[in-house]
């Protein structure tokens, strides 16, 4: 988006209505999905085992942190960074990860 008014309107919408509107739990996220594990996804896409363990994952457009929480939970060796246009939605993502013990409070 190059129109500042449009960007501000989108940010305002997501500040008011963080997405996705999933409940915030006081525990790690439930279940397992191979798509959230970088090694499984890498192997699926390339047909090879990853050659290294130290990895950085960018969750661009992380929204309320549902995907970020799974990425951190299923990839404890990785550095995971979530970014989003909406400060309000990022606050929800941070709370989600802190409450599920996936993020150290700062």
UniProtKB/Swiss-Prot annotation:
One Gene Ontology MF term: methyltransferase activity
Sorted UniProt keywords: Antenna complex, Phycobilisome
GO CC, alphabetical: phycobilisome
Name of one Pfam family that matches: Methyltransf_31
Tree of life domain: Bacteria
Induction per the UniProt record: Present in both red- and green-light-grown cells.
Name of the protein in question: Uncharacterized phycocyanin operon protein W
